[in-house]
Swiss-Prot record:
<feature type="binding site">
    <location>
        <position position="257"/>
    </location>
    <ligand>
        <name>NAD(+)</name>
    </ligand>
</feature>
<dbReference type="InterPro" id="IPR036291">
    <property type="entry name" value="NAD(P)-bd_dom_sf"/>
</dbReference>
<dbReference type="InterPro" id="IPR006139">
    <property type="entry name" value="D-isomer_2_OHA_DH_cat_dom"/>
</dbReference>
<keyword id="KW-0520">NAD</keyword>
<comment type="similarity">
    <text>Belongs to the D-isomer specific 2-hydroxyacid dehydrogenase family. PdxB subfamily.</text>
</comment>
<keyword id="KW-0664">Pyridoxine biosynthesis</keyword>
<feature type="binding site">
    <location>
        <position position="258"/>
    </location>
    <ligand>
        <name>substrate</name>
    </ligand>
</feature>
<dbReference type="InterPro" id="IPR024531">
    <property type="entry name" value="Erythronate-4-P_DHase_dimer"/>
</dbReference>
<feature type="active site">
    <location>
        <position position="208"/>
    </location>
</feature>
<feature type="binding site">
    <location>
        <position position="232"/>
    </location>
    <ligand>
        <name>NAD(+)</name>
    </ligand>
</feature>
<keyword id="KW-0963">Cytoplasm</keyword>
<comment type="pathway">
    <text>Cofactor biosynthesis; pyridoxine 5'-phosphate biosynthesis; pyridoxine 5'-phosphate from D-erythrose 4-phosphate: step 2/5.</text>
</comment>
<keyword id="KW-0560">Oxidoreductase</keyword>
<dbReference type="InterPro" id="IPR038251">
    <property type="entry name" value="PdxB_dimer_sf"/>
</dbReference>
<feature type="active site">
    <location>
        <position position="237"/>
    </location>
</feature>
<comment type="function">
    <text>Catalyzes the oxidation of erythronate-4-phosphate to 3-hydroxy-2-oxo-4-phosphonooxybutanoate.</text>
</comment>
<dbReference type="GO" id="GO:0008615">
    <property type="term" value="P:pyridoxine biosynthetic process"/>
</dbReference>
């Protein structure tokens, strides 16, 4: 069996090595010729899997995408070809949720305010949006949800987008990209909607770059410095508008979901599905893949303040590091930029490929004196806290 896998997908050798010959490739430059003799194809969101890519292959049995979304996969075509397909919904939801929560803590610290006093509107209440909500609700922050696709079948309370924008002073975006239809998300936040944001609103985009009109965002930010922005995703990736970067408080290269746990979970979910397709018993465990955290545990002597919670979060992931690297790579240091016309696209893809794979809150064990008032840290995701 020949397995072709994206070179940036972790633990492929550990999980699939016993099943056949593995060839790793650059997902952006994959061609029909390169996959013509593949039995299994493992990709990420940077690879379009369609009739064109598979035109020379007559033996493919399984396509796996270590992603939440499937907009890069022609699933109808795979069904016609009777090629099994699986993605990994929710694999990085915890990572995205914690990323957004940490970004909000960083904004609160930078601008001398309290996250706990904010009203956070979450646009898109699927896996990642719900993960953000869990973090915020564990900390005691008021959360508003907007998701017209699931509100009729979901018992949670939802509000309209207009109401959310009116009431919220933090907005976090977690929707798939949809270019047409009643609930189109392409340029969901256009210039008009951006201008309608409350004074001092924080806007975070951790889903798809084109959900926010980036050119319009520049125009609005030039007039409204009160709006604070966190962008992990960019219109036109992997070539973001460099002129937008100075207007963004925290800028990262589409790595919100890049926790070690999340990336391992995505690959592992594909391993589980392929074993089902092959009719084989699973022989690998995901937790066995993960290294030990750098410290066994930290001891809390009292309930942490918001500043202490930020410091605790920085033990697991310091967002400032990725922000500084992003700016240095795309704006400042020519030595960090890839050659013109290279597949690394001036460093954006290179940053993703070389990301240090942060850990999730669960990797850090907290010891306490047993006080029940820190139980909320367990709900936030840390291990070993509370009663």
């Amino acid at each position: 069996m020949k397995i072709i896998a994206d070179e940036n997908m972790p633990y492929v050798q550990e999980l699939f090595g016993d099943l056949g010959i593995i060839e790793t490739v650059n997902g952006r430059s994959l061609t029909a010729e390169m996959v013509k003799d593949a039995d299994v194809l493992l990709v990420r969101s940077v690879t379009q899997v369609d009739a064109s890519l598979l035109s020379k292959n007559s033996q493919l049995t399984f396509v796996g995408s270590a992603t939440i979304g499937t907009d890069h996969i022609d699933t109808e075509y795979l069904t016609q070809r009777q090629i099994s397909f699986s993605n990994a919904p929710g694999c990085n939801a915890t990572a995205v949720g914690e990323f957004a929560f940490i970004a909000m803590l960083e904004l609160a610290n930078r601008f001398g305010t309290s996250l706990k006093d904010k009203v956070v509107g979450i646009v898109g209440a699927g896996n990642t949006g719900s993960a953000v909500a869990r973090c915020l609700q564990a900390y005691g922050v008021e959360v508003l949800l907007h998701d017209p696709l699931i509100e009729k079948s979901d018992p949670r309370n939802f509000v309209s987008l207009d109401e959310l924008i009116t009431r919220a002073n933090v907005i976090s975006l977690h929707v798939p990209i949809t270019k047409s239809g009643e609930h189109k998300t392409w340029y969901l936040f256009d210039e008009s909607r951006l201008n309608s944001l409350n004074a001092d609103t924080w806007l975070l985009n951790c889903c798809r770059g084109e959900v926010v009109d980036n050119r319009a965002l520049i125009n609005v930010k030039q007039q409204r410095a009160d709006i604070k922005v966190v962008l992990d995703v960019w219109e036109g990736e992997p070539n973001p508008m460099r002129e937008l970067i100075p207007y963004v408080e925290f800028a990262t290269p589409h790595i919100a979901g890049y926790s070690l746990e999340g990336k391992a979970r995505g690959t592992y979910m594909l391993y589980q599905k392929l074993m089902q397709v092959l009719g084989k018993k699973e022989e690998k465990e995901m937790l066995a893949l993960l290294p030990s955290f750098w410290t066994e545990q930290l001891t809390l002597t009292k309930e942490p303040s918001e500043k202490a919670l930020l410091q605790l979060s920085r033990f697991v992931y310091d967002l400032r590091d990725d922000d500084a690297l992003f700016r240095a790579t795309l704006l400042e240091d020519p030595s960090k930029k890839a050659p013109v016309n290279s597949s690394n696209n001036n460093g954006f893809d290179l940053m993703r490929k070389n990301h240090k794979h942060r850990r999730e809150f669960s990797a850090l064990t907290l010891a306490t004196t047993g006080q029940s008032e820190v139980d909320w840290l367990l709900n936030l995701g840390y291990s070993g806290v509370g009663r």
